[in-house]
Amino acid sequence: MYVRVMAAVIACILLSGEALSAFAITPATENLSWFKKKKKKPEEREEKSKSDYEKLVEGSKTTKGMFAVHQKKNDFYFEIPTALLGRDLLVVNKLQRVPAELNEAGVNRGVNYENQMVCMEWDKASGKLMFRQQRPLPLAPRTDAIFRSVQDNFISPLIAAFKIEAVNADSTALVIKVNDIYDGTETSINNVFTNINLGTSAIKNLSRILSIKSFSNNVVATSELTTRVTEGTTTVYVTVEVSSSILLLPETPMMGRFDNQKVGYFTNPLLNFSDAQQGTDKTQYITRWRMEPKPEDREAYLKGQIVEPAKPIVFYIDNSTPYQWRSYIKKGIEDWQVAFEKAGFKNAIIAKEITDSMHVDMDDVNYSVLTYAASEKKNAMGPSLLDPRSGEILEADIMWWHNVLSMVREWITVQTGTVCPEARKVQLPDDLMGDAIRFVACHEVGHSLGLRHNMMGSWAFPTDSLRSETFTSRMNSTASSIMDYARFNYIAQPGDGVKVLSPHIGPYDMFAIEYGYRWYGKNTPEEEKTLLFNFLSKHTDRLYKYSEAQDVRDAVDPRAQNEDLGDDPVRSSLLGIENLKRIVPQILQWTTTGEKGQTYEEASRLYYAVINQWNNYLYHVLANIGGIYIENTTVGDGIKTYTFVEKEKQQAALKFLLNEVLTYPKWLFDTEVGQYTYLLRNTPVGKQENAPTQILKNAQAYILWDLLGNNRLMRMIENESVNGKKAFTVVELMDGLHKNIFGVTERGGVPNVMERSLQKNFLDALLTAAAEPEAVKINKKIADEHFLLDHATPF
């Protein structure tokens, strides 16, 4: 028996594994393990082998958000959900810190230097994640046959490819290494040195990633990038700190709103196709924030009740802003609330000071910030971040360069010093400066809301009305729009009793915000067209006129100019000059502080500011000569689009120029202050002194060159051909100039040195004009296509 049992056991040991397993469950084999040779189990039987994903995330520092960000030592990885593949993303690149050389040029923290829309695609064949630059497709009705062509005809470029390092366990996320796009190696989504006009590349071993953060709908990388710039035999290293964000755009774009030439909004153009067309055209959507009532308030809103928006606009004031100015900036931002109430929304725009107790991360691109930059640049700027598909403003940054305060201070003194005793000091009181800071902030926020400059705002107020205490108090401004370059009331004379001297929100601003932000509850832009037309038809008064900015030296419409006030340029400028004549004898007194060792630098600064103001007045008047009134017309409104400036006004303009600049303005250039200081001017090589007579010669030369420019002369010739004797002609212009400039010589007299200088300027201008090409296209368009950022003039 024993032998048979042992034979059976040995036979079982020789069976296959499956047979052994079946046999092993019988009671007879429970204690036979001593027959087996003991082997150490392989490690993989104790623990499953780790996947590429598990190996990658093991030991990583991980941040959760739109993408999970994994950091292993100096390597950074994005874990990208496959649900986001194909979604539209916006890359937003900003400067965070810059060297002194760039800072002095106004390239500072917060400047947005490059944006582009992208999407991601998984190329499974190559094992790569592709970045494709997305360009909004042209518009076309889905029911039209041409819609298929729009979908099939256009392709956007691939700009970057990433090896897929790992896929998570359930294949819902891909992992890519992103060092190259943030350390300067790859420039497809961040090309800072090209965009700030250095045209160089980052040096890899001198560039690095500082951090990457992930938020709910965006991820931001902060990098320190270094380049080498060579000029001649000199090499300079330039390091900048930049942030590069990838922002998830709304899955459903905001409904666009059509632009109208009667209202000044920045626009987002999209090509438009349809079967009914016999050509192509562009649809222009205005740029604006998504401002909608809450779902539960929509019925009340449409009945005319004022409600709170579902999402208000919030601006954060940078904690580097000097304390004494913060309240004024806050007021300037929130001044727009009255305009939003006209559009049916209360508490629609809010300003908050950033404090240490706030849980606000300024690296999150969702936050709109007023950034205060320690810079010599004299300006402020209000750019916006747009969804290119719809024109929706997603975020806005107000750039505030510190030295704008010096320019504002000069305006206050030069434009209001004769009627405001507090303006006659080197160091102005905080409340006076604060009022000016408030209007600058308000103007810049207007840009951040989508509004363009409206240079017709100042013309809306009659010149003489700006001397009325009653009118100025009622209108509470110097113009109908804060978006004009209308500064302080230089027209008011001592004794007029005018108290309101600065610009504020006006009728045009409220009208423009209502056009852009009133919610109609419609589903398509086309459904709003009639409602918007009806709204515009109720606002035809001069208070609601709009006109773009023009070239200062060749303005076509004299009503729409920079730095002007009133509707009569000659009278406004004469009143302004009367005030300047009162200021010049007081320059030394107003700029003397009593400080031991004080120089005449402040006197020189104020003297130069007075001359600049005088020069502004000259060009306000010059625009009348050869000028054309240009209206934004529609068929059937009974208004002419183009009307030449009246002959009498052009004659008065020439008389003004002959009396005020094409002569020797002794009151301005033969002064006591000129005995103590020359005019100081900042140049790229430092401060430069200029003799007053040199400044006068330059002013006369520019006026004569611009009077005799071909564009102006061709407009005058056209006027004469259309209106005959009712026109102010080129012959009359030349005759007036010749008689005035050479009058002494023709009468047999001997011209003095200043008269000879003017005669030479006139001859130079004639030679310059004669050298211009004869064929000139008559320019009736006021301005070229707009730029979202203003560079040429302050604000």
Role assignments for model-derived ranges:
Residues 79, 111, 280, 319, ...:
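Soluble non-cytosolic domains of exported or imported proteins
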Residues 32-35, 48, 353-373, 435-492:
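The catalytic-center signature of Zn2+-dependent metalloproteases
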Residues 27-77, 81-321, 339, 348, ...:
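Auxiliary tRNA-acceptor-end handling modules of aminoacyl-tRNA synthetases
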